[in-house]
Amino acid sequence: MNNILVINGPNLNLLGKREPDIYGNITLENINQKIKLHFKNEDLKIDFFQSNEEGKIIDKIIESEKKYNAIVINPAAYSHYSIAILDAMRSINIPVVEVHLSNIYKREEYRKKSVTAEASLGVISGFGYYGYIMAIEFILNNLVRENNIVVH
């Protein structure tokens, strides 16, 4: 069985209430349910983790290498400045795909740069919750099923 960890960063626990004009009315719990439902027929275990604390996210990334085949991460605001999360992502030997619900390139200038993207295989931005599904599909189709070796 393949194991994938989905990490969500700060304020994503406020989805459904926070800036619905940008993020819609969907909650993080709804997103997690949609992801699980989409992959219910796969030989796949998906765990979800959310924290507003940078250190907890870093710890989870570092611990993940022992338990997971890959990570899907939405670092949220940390993506724009957290060298510590970037370093944690670089320190592990499993693939990471970065996801953003909104199109960060259509947002404020300071949101257009993702430092954490440097340690990601790729970034999916602007497709709402479906970005998580796209990331997991990529992982399953290109990394797990074909046994491709991924080098950061």
UniProtKB/Swiss-Prot annotation:
It is an enzyme of class 4 (lyase). This is 3-dehydroquinate dehydratase. Homododecamer. Pathway: Metabolic intermediate biosynthesis; chorismate biosynthesis; chorismate from D-erythrose 4-phosphate and phosphoenolpyruvate: step 3/7. It comes from Clostridium botulinum (strain Langeland / NCTC 10281 / Type F). Keywords: Amino-acid biosynthesis, Aromatic amino acid biosynthesis, Lyase. The lineage of its organism: Bacteria, Bacillati, Bacillota, Clostridia, Eubacteriales. The gene is aroQ. Pfam families: DHquinase_II (PF01220). One of its GO terms (biological process) is chorismate biosynthetic process. Belongs to the type-II 3-dehydroquinase family. Its EC number is 4.2.1.10. The record marks 18 as: Transition state stabilizer. NCBIfam families: aroQ, PRK05395.1-2, PRK05395.1-3, PRK05395.1-4. GO terms for molecular function: 3-dehydroquinate dehydratase activity. Catalyzes a trans-dehydration via an enolate intermediate. It comes from the Bacteria.
